[in-house]
Amino acid sequence: LISFKSNTMSSATAVIPRLHHLKPVNLVALNPQDGQRYGLAHGDIVRITTPGGQAQAQISLLHGVMPGVIAIEHGYGHKEMGAAQHTLDGEPMAFDEQIKSGINLNELGFADPTRQVANTWLDWVSGASVRQGLPARIERV
């Protein structure tokens, strides 16, 4: 599983309603060969499971994704930044449920399955979170 930057969503743009209208959820893509191998069609709903979590999404089959890879667009599925109801001095603040839409890649987790304690899975070469190589399983819902 890899992630890629969105052309519309980021932490700075997640609160813009017009962008959510144009693209309400993030793209989850597979190569068409993988779709055929797993009996998946463009638009199917799938469950993606990693060592750190799972999520459901609608898939797109795209030739630009390398076979064997699940590609998820980063920048969706926010839990705050106006997505949750809060109060200030007893007054409810405005919020927008749409900001929650899509998969938050962080919720698929970067938990290291090789450790006995909760720990972030780090790339041994770069020392960064394993964001571009999470092992994942995909199945039709």
Mark where each language-model region is:
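Long, low-complexity segments enriched in small/aliphatic residues
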Residues: 1-16
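Long, contiguous, secondary-structure-rich segments that constitute the structural scaffold
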Residues: 13-29, 33-141
